Amino acid sequence: YQPYGQSNIGISGCGPTCMAMVIYSLTRNSDALPDMLAQEAMTGGYYIMGTGTAWSFMNECASAYGVIASQFASLEQWELEDRLEDGNMIICAMGPGDFSAQGHFIVIYDYTSDGFCVNDPFSYTNSSKKWDYATLSSQWQQIWVYAA
């Protein structure tokens, strides 16, 4: 793995990895790879030592690749579902809980009657199950909704 901050992208690169998922899914731009975005975050000053990827990267990186970002402190379940139905993708900054003991970024890309579909760049297990709104909303600290 490419170095990222005090570790490598496989361990602490959830922010750039989530952005790569969103950018590719919405634009099909294959230049926006996790290692490329991690390098952009490092050189652009979006990596905060001891913390990880700055939240501002989630807006600035999207804009650089022609993706529209809207940032929210929270969304109601119906708002989350509406945005997903409209073809948007969502990144959440998660606090301590099911996804991490500290902070972590995940992608919400769909929902079914069983719950929300998540891509967790650090956990295949978390990505393989459905998540209910109450669990997600009790742990997120910030939400970005992305549109092409």
Mark where each language-model region is.
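Active-site-adjacent structural segments surrounding the nucleophilic cysteine of cysteine proteases
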Residues: 1-48
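Extracytoplasmic/secreted envelope proteins and their assembly/folding machinery
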Residues: 15-23, 34, 38, 55-62, ...
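Solvent-exposed loop/turn segments at secondary-structure junctions
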Residues: 21, 28, 43-48, 75-78, ...
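Mid-length scaffold segments of soluble, non-membrane domains
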Residues: 32-34, 39-73
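Alpha-helix boundary recognition
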Residues: 63, 84-85, 137
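Active-site-adjacent substructure of cysteine-protease-like catalytic cores
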Residues: 68-117
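Noncatalytic regulatory segments and standalone regulatory/sensor domains
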Residues: 111-148
